[in-house]
């Protein structure tokens, strides 16, 4: 299999997302052209470090590149002020300069945190994303959104800071626990739902074999990245089209906050549930036929994924409380909730005028089924 390259066209800040097998084994050769001096600082997590840090550093050694590494605790709870401050202080202790490169080796949590640390360190240093989860490869590593969570909600503090390079080694996805792989698939299916009905139809057939079929996996990652790159090139800072990428996320972020950013609900699981709710909301508003949410739920079930609120273990707050959590979402405009709705599969659009009582009724019905 060959390596695919998808270019994110952002003028002087354009970069490539390279997708294929064996990219960690030759990471040194891939990163070397970016370096002013042969040294990088790696931010990772303890789980990823145990699997991939040594091979990654060996690849750097083979290219004559020295490295230092900090492994943070794994999990969404790391994506907050304490570990962010720890990472920034460590980078300063390592004397990382403005012309140096920080490497984010890990999933979405590490990519977001490391990217934000790079954005604020000395008012901005370059960084390279080496995403090791399906979710990070198809979504969070591309497009320059970085940040952390706060007590008030998810991703409320951050910056747009584009990477200089993304290396998506599809081989490392074979080390993912099945639950994490399925969670990442929530972001893959999102792309078909928001703007490519043919891709969604292909996923309905190919989805169940992605974990075991490297060629299908690479195709899924490549098409997802192509779609994201096209949208980011049109709307880097989410003034318009880029909001489409938040399909399912208004519900998702409220549910993540309600479950304490814990293992009760992984981000990609929340995205899948959020997409199902967004399509159900669209149907209730008369925007799409009942076939669309039914078809989506059937596919997610076939993939063994969480689909409804009843699939989330433990207690959940009331519909009113979930609405209050949504009101803190960063997509709120003039105090009004912004949803990504759909006229059908592959036909998403941004809606700023969704009646709150319809959303409340949807949540009440979903909670009643638990």
From Swiss-Prot:
Name of the protein described by the UniProt record: 3-dehydroquinate synthase
EC number, as in UniProt: 4.2.3.4
Catalysis: reaction(s): 7-phospho-2-dehydro-3-deoxy-D-arabino-heptonate = 3-dehydroquinate + phosphate
Cofactor stoichiometry and binding remark: Binds 1 divalent metal cation per subunit. Can use either Co(2+) or Zn(2+).
Pathway the protein takes part in: Metabolic intermediate biosynthesis; chorismate biosynthesis; chorismate from D-erythrose 4-phosphate and phosphoenolpyruvate: step 2/7
Residues involved in NAD(+) binding: 108-112, 132-133, 145, 154
Recorded superkingdom: Bacteria
One cellular component (GO) term of this entry: cytoplasm
Keywords linked to the UniProt accession: Amino-acid biosynthesis, Aromatic amino acid biosynthesis, Cobalt, Cytoplasm, Lyase, Metal-binding, NAD, Nucleotide-binding, Zinc
Cofactors named for this entry: Co(2+); Zn(2+); NAD(+)
Source organism: Cereibacter sphaeroides (strain KD131 / KCTC 12085) (Rhodobacter sphaeroides)
Enzymatic class: lyase
Subcellular localization, as worded in the UniProt entry: Cytoplasm
Pfam families: DHQ_synthase (PF01761), DHQS_C (PF24621)
Signal peptide range: none
Positions annotated to bind Zn(2+): 187, 249, 267
Function according to Swiss-Prot or TrEMBL: Catalyzes the conversion of 3-deoxy-D-arabino-heptulosonate 7-phosphate (DAHP) to dehydroquinate (DHQ).
Record flagged with keyword ATP-binding: no
Keyword Cytoplasm: yes
Any GO BP: aromatic amino acid family biosynthetic process
GO molecular function: 3-dehydroquinate synthase activity; metal ion binding; nucleotide binding
UniProt record similarity statement: Belongs to the sugar phosphate cyclases superfamily. Dehydroquinate synthase family.
